[in-house]
Amino acid sequence: MTITQVKVKKLDNFFGKLPEYATDHSAGMDLTAANEQPITIKAGEIQLIPTGIAIALPELFEAQIRPRSGLAAKNGITVANSPGTIDADYRGEIKVILINLGKDDFVIEKGMRIAQMVISKYERISWKESETLEETARGSGGFGSTGVYL
């Protein structure tokens, strides 16, 4: 297995430890909150949460910011723009846009694990305009066209 090294910069507000994989087969690394004061996300509201890190991804890599399943299932806290995308040329602080879909206010404390980051390769494409597209069994069916039940 090839391990790609990615530069990470700890910013002045950094707290805790760098993101790391929890198990040998984890796809994502937990991101932690680096807010100076507790941030309350009221029910139905959105807050931008700092992480205290900036990264330099290699060309043709991206980082996706995804919800943590436990926060979502137990508290209704999820990533509003899931998945959020960090492009390879972005050098600013990684921040997480959290939304509270629950019924109760939720407080984000410094050091709390708030989201996960998955880093992956991607391909760039170029468009080739065409008047026709190859036929498939699915065709233009979408938005529930295959039904709800198996």
From Swiss-Prot:
Reported cofactor(s): Mg(2+)
GO terms (BP aspect): dUMP biosynthetic process; dUTP catabolic process
UniProt binding sites for substrate: 68-70, 81, 85-87, 95
EC number: 3.6.1.23
EC class (word): hydrolase
Keyword annotations: Hydrolase, Magnesium, Metal-binding, Nucleotide metabolism
Top-level taxon of the source organism: Bacteria
Pathway linked to the protein: Pyrimidine metabolism; dUMP biosynthesis; dUMP from dCTP (dUTP route): step 2/2
Classification via InterPro entries: dUTPase (IPR008181), dUTPase-like (IPR029054), dUTPase-like_sf (IPR036157), dUTPase_trimeric (IPR033704)
Pfam families (alphabetical): dUTPase
Molecular functions per Gene Ontology: dUTP diphosphatase activity; magnesium ion binding
Catalytic activity, reaction form: dUTP + H2O = dUMP + diphosphate + H(+)
Key word Cytoplasm present: no
NCBIfam families the record matches: dut (TIGR00576), PRK00601.1 (NF001862)
Function: This enzyme is involved in nucleotide metabolism: it produces dUMP, the immediate precursor of thymidine nucleotides and it decreases the intracellular concentration of dUTP so that uracil cannot be incorporated into DNA.
Family the entry assigns: Belongs to the dUTPase family.
PANTHER family from the UniProt entry: DEOXYURIDINE 5'-TRIPHOSPHATE NUCLEOTIDOHYDROLASE (PTHR11241:SF0)
HAMAP family (alphabetical): dUTPase_bact
Protein name: Deoxyuridine 5'-triphosphate nucleotidohydrolase
Source organism of the structure: Rickettsia bellii (strain OSU 85-389)
Gene giving rise to this polypeptide: dut
